[in-house]
Amino acid sequence: MTEMTKPFLIVIVGPTASGKTELSIEVAKKFNGEIISGDSMQVYQGMDIGTAKVTTEEMEGIPHYMIDILPPDASFSAYEFKKRAEKYIKDITRRGKVPIIAGGTGLYIQSLLYNYAFEDESISEDKMKQVKLKLKELEHLNNNKLHEYLASFDKESAKDIHPNNRKRVLRAIEYYLKTKKLLSSRKKVQQFTENYDTLLIGIEMSRETLYLRINKRVDIMLGHGLFNEVQHLVEQGFEASQSMQAIGYKELVPVIKGNISMENAVEKLKQHSRQYAKRQLTWFKNKMNVHWLNKERMSLQMMLDEITTQINKRSSNHDCKRKHPRPSTREL
């Protein structure tokens, strides 16, 4: 894929509770775009409040993709995200619209934007049964013990993945069980060639402001029925599913079981959310070339104006005969 034929897309990233949904919808309205969720948990049906899933009213008529596509007990990976998102980008671009990726799952977005060489992990049915049995055996381990198990055969991946990121730890273990190769070894040979002509926008603010927003959003989620949502998922038999290790769900299950108080669970939920936001910022700042917009200094309109400026500035540096032109902002 040459530079002149790369489709243009806008990517909006940032930590949890930073306002990605609101900005992405306004950008879509202004630039004739459609939105692809870049959140690893919003793919799951019935997990709405805890994942801060955009509502129909909030969409304001803007098409959204990669939301509510799987049951809570289904597995989902960066590879699967990449495959599906690529199809949506191709279709959106073909119809003359601008694909907009909005989300906070750094690995998923990075795998889409760059030429990740995912290996074929298909295995025989018997081998898959063995893998599932082993993963089932590991379910009872807490996060630290599971992380120690990963470190026993893949120290590099263990260093790169936080113990509380149970989903990524399990993914690294599953990869090894399937291929007998280390996930860390695969990453070393990745080719970071850009797949798209990307305007990568990030939302930032002071840590104090972000943490206040996170705490407030947790309170709002609880007020909107998060506990009932988690209880319903447990009653449906999804308690042991990988998706239930997401922040907002794993903290409330012990309350349902009568193991901890709601007060303690809420404090843990807020703490885990703040820690996750910190990890998100570290990922985006270290691994991606993001143009940051400060939410404390800029209004929503100022952000839109800056995005317009960036599009025009980038357009002036490219041949106007590109196959997939950026949206014109001359009449906006």
Swiss-Prot record:
Residues 320-332 have a biased composition (Basic residues). This is tRNA dimethylallyltransferase. Its EC number is 2.5.1.75. GO terms for molecular function: ATP binding; tRNA dimethylallyltransferase activity. It is an enzyme of class 2 (transferase). Its cofactor is Mg(2+). It catalyses: adenosine(37) in tRNA + dimethylallyl diphosphate = N(6)-dimethylallyladenosine(37) in tRNA + diphosphate. Monomer. Belongs to the IPP transferase family. ATP binds at residues 14-21. Residues 312-332 are annotated as: Disordered. Substrate binds at residues 16-21. Catalyzes the transfer of a dimethylallyl group onto the adenine at position 37 in tRNAs that read codons beginning with uridine, leading to the formation of N6-(dimethylallyl)adenosine (i(6)A). GO terms for biological process: tRNA modification. Residues 39-42, 167-171, 245-250, 278-285 are annotated as: Interaction with substrate tRNA. The record marks 105 as: Interaction with substrate tRNA. Keywords: ATP-binding, Magnesium, Nucleotide-binding, Transferase, tRNA processing.
